Amino acid sequence: MAGCLVTGNEDGAHSCVAHVLWAMQEFGFTIPPNVNAYWVNKAGPGKSYIEAGGERYLYTNKTLFNTIYNLIFFAKLLKQHPIDTNLLELKELAKQESEPEE
């Protein structure tokens, strides 16, 4: 199970989240929907998250709560219904449907 929390502004945060979550799923993590949160502030230098009162910022808190609750929900779901995929069996099925490799 994985989610992503980053600091930064809109475009940079989206790019970071996309790369991190893609990499995590490549390692076998389950990625539920809407499991990223970031702080949106004015672009450029300025106050830090804490100095600007970021912990009271509605958008950040909304996406953070979405992230937390979706991660918890899917963790419970996977605990009750584990994914029992056998990758070796799937590889053999794929071989049967494929042209022989040279």
Task: State where each predicted segment sits.
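Glycine-rich phosphate/pyrophosphate-binding loop and the adjoining helix
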Residues: 25-102
